[in-house]
């Protein structure tokens, strides 16, 4: 994912479930990219998980992660603080947004420059108890336009249904 993000020219969209890796590495990983492009983050809504324990329990079982709602809550808190710090910095050239969604997560996705001919995405599908071994696909708009457009349309549904937390 990071290598793809490094190729971005104008913007990066990152869709994840718990976003734990990104939350741990945000200050190193995203700070450099924010010098060149804007970044948009989408993750599960931690409040929704806390208030919908059955749903959270299903996701806990699906991902094989104990206390999944708490795990998402901690990642969200960390990412929110990072976004606020970055956006409040008067020297920050590009902004970062953070939005949450409640739809069942089926994949994580990183999309760079979706409105250009050089657009590209990496899609990682979640399967039951998959751990770190997940099917991963790199899709270039120039080579497989229909597939790229189809998957990006799927992502746009999520973008439109999400709730902006940091604008």
Where are these regions (language model features)?
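PLD-like (HKD) phosphodiesterase/transphosphatidyltransferase domain
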Residues: 1-59, 139-154
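A generic structural signal for short, solvent-exposed coil/turn residues
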Residues: 4-6, 33, 90, 101, ...
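Generic secondary-structure microfeatures
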Residues: 16, 43-45, 83, 102, ...
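Short glycine-/polar-rich loops that comprise or flank the Walker A/P-loop
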Residues: 35-37, 92-96, 119
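HKD-type phospholipase D/PLD-like phosphodiesterase module
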Residues: 52-107
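Short flexible/disordered coil segments
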Residues: 76-82, 105-110, 155-167
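HKD (HxKxxxxD) catalytic microenvironment of the phospholipase D
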Residues: 96-136
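Signature of lipid phosphatidyltransferase scaffolds
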Residues: 122-167
